[in-house]
Structures are given as structure tokens and as C-alpha cells.
UniProtKB/Swiss-Prot annotation:
Disulfide bonds: none annotated. It holds the Pfam family GCV_H. One of its GO terms (cellular component) is cytoplasm. GO terms for biological process: glycine decarboxylation via glycine cleavage system. Binds 1 lipoyl cofactor covalently. It comes from Methylorubrum populi (strain ATCC BAA-705 / NCIMB 13946 / BJ001). This is Glycine cleavage system H protein.
Length: 120
């Protein structure tokens, strides 16, 4: 299940763990990424809390926790190569994995069609 937020994050659910990243739209708006800061594994995040930072030559932008849960993994490759996040934001450029407190909360997020309309 793939879902999107109005803060331009995407989530892909596998069991009760969601992989989180920025959308292609967000990556395009930011331009070339030069720095990525990710949350620490084991940290509990609350929906809406700043979880990560992506910085481009244009601007720095917070990435908010789309749902509440515990960080189980971070994309180390994104730390060493921030450009990979912009090059493949919804694939190899994922940011972190979040074990969700409530999987059913995914239902409140936008599906791909709704996000495409939102991002126009």
C-alpha cells in the first residue's frame, strides 16, 4: 500500500512497517540535495513531528513524521550520497522505516491519484 501526505512524504507499507521518503514532486521543487539528516534508530516519532532534514542548494526542508511509530532503520546510503534521494526519491532514495503504532492510520492518507491532484 502506497500513501502520500500533504507535506509531500510517501509511505509504502510492508506488514506494520512503513518505508518513508519525500515525493518526486518535493525532490523536484528542492533541486540538487547536498545534505540529509535522518532520525536515530529506536526513536519514537509522533505524527507531525520533524523527523528528518533534506537540504538542497536552494533550501533546507524538514521531513515530518507522517504517522506515529518507532524508527527501525535508516537509509545509510542517503546519508553518504544525498543526491541519491533526489535522483530516486520513491525508490533507492527512501529515508527511514517506521514501525507504525496504528497501521489503520494509513487509510487517512492520500492514495496516488489524490496526491497527483493535490500536487498540481
Amino acid at each position: 500500500m502506497l500513501r502520500f501526505t500533504d507535506e509531500h512524504e510517501w509511505l509504502r507499507l510492508d506488514g506494520d512497517v512503513a518505508t518513508v521518503g519525500i515525493t518526486a514532486h518535493a525532490a523536484e521543487q528542492l533541486g540538487d540535495l547536498v545534505f540529509v539528516e535522518l532520525p536515530k534508530v529506536g526513536v519514537k516519532l509522533t505524527k507531525g513531528e520533524a523527523a528528518a532534514v533534506v537540504e538542497s542548494v536552494k533550501a533546507a526542508s524538514d521531513v515530518y513524521a507522517p504517522l506515529s511509530g518507532e524508527v527501525t532503520e535508516v537509509n545509510e546510503a542517503a546519508l553518504s550520497d544525498p543526491a541519491s534521494v533526489g535522483a530516486d526519491p520513491q525508490g533507492a532514495g527512501w529515508l527511514y522505516r517506521l514501525k507504525l503504532d496504528d497501521v489503520s492510520a494509513m487509510d487517512a492518507l492520500m492514495d496516488e491519484a489524490a496526491y497527483a491532484d493535490f500536487a498540481k
